[in-house]
């Protein structure tokens, strides 16, 4: 499971969409993000699960039981891959329809975000400028003290600490003041953005297109369920021999172990 968690974490860290608000990168579509995540996660589960099965089969207990789990795991992985291939086109059709139906709302929200970004950018620039100035001032104040320490003896450590403490406290106080000022400046724009979003969603809620979209979404989900039934049945049929083989191998191993215990 560590491999699964690590893979998912890397995916989200490298695939984060937060940067698109401040940069001009072209974000992935909802379908692309969902498809990439599903592929990465399932592959991670498959690979890590196979590793655990291999480790068990090569152990002393695994060799004694001889359950042939690795063969069953490969058969199960093949069946699941087939299911993904069959359902994939239907799912993609649903997401494409969802993106098309919500394009107007997304365009309006992107416009609102861009307007707010332009309004708050000067405050962000000012915050960055003041913070850099304070850090540089702190560095200039500390640099002579570092030279003094290198040239002095150990007994000056306490003296140096006493000199650094007020400077560090001053830097923290300045940073806290800058953050408070930035929060005060940004608060109206944050409220404005929330109000705009609420208005957009309320307008969407009251529009007749929402009811149409809900009906279309229900229709697409029903179609997805109908088209997925054959694939799910194939998965069930593929699992039956795997489970039966596993059960027979297990009981065979139990019988063999019982016989060995009886003869001892």
Curated annotation (Swiss-Prot):
| Subcellular location as annotated | Secreted
GO molecular function per UniProt:
cholesterol transfer activity; phosphatidylcholine-sterol O-acyltransferase activator activity; phospholipid binding; protein homodimerization activity
Keywords noted in UniProt: Cholesterol metabolism, Glycoprotein, HDL, Lipid metabolism, Lipid transport, Lipoprotein, Oxidation, Palmitate, Phosphoprotein, Repeat, Secreted, Signal, Steroid metabolism, Sterol metabolism, Transport
Q: Name one Pfam family in it.
A: Apolipoprotein
Question: In this chain, where does the modification Methionine sulfoxide occur?
Answer: 109
Report the InterPro entries cross-referenced here.
Answer: ApoA_E, Apolipoprotein_A1/A4/E
Give me the sequence repeat coordinates as residue ranges.
67-88, 89-110, 111-121, 122-143, 144-165, 166-187, 188-207, 208-229, 230-240, 241-264
UniProt's post-translational modification comment states:
Glycosylated.
Predominant place of localization = secreted
Gene Ontology terms: cellular component: chylomicron; extracellular vesicle; high-density lipoprotein particle; low-density lipoprotein particle; very-low-density lipoprotein particle
Q: Where is the signal peptide?
A: 1-18
Region 10 X approximate tandem repeats: which residues? 67-264
For the biological process aspect of GO, one term held by this record is: phospholipid efflux
Query: What PANTHER family does the record tag this protein with?
Result: APOLIPOPROTEIN (PTHR18976), APOLIPOPROTEIN A-I (PTHR18976:SF11)
Quote the function comment for this protein.
Participates in the reverse transport of cholesterol from tissues to the liver for excretion by promoting cholesterol efflux from tissues and by acting as a cofactor for the lecithin cholesterol acyltransferase (LCAT). As part of the SPAP complex, activates spermatozoa motility.
Q: Could you describe the subunit structure of this protein?
A: Homodimer. Interacts with APOA1BP and CLU. Component of a sperm activating protein complex (SPAP), consisting of APOA1, an immunoglobulin heavy chain, an immunoglobulin light chain and albumin. Interacts with NDRG1. Interacts with SCGB3A2. Interacts with NAXE and YJEFN3.
Supply the name of the protein.
Apolipoprotein A-I
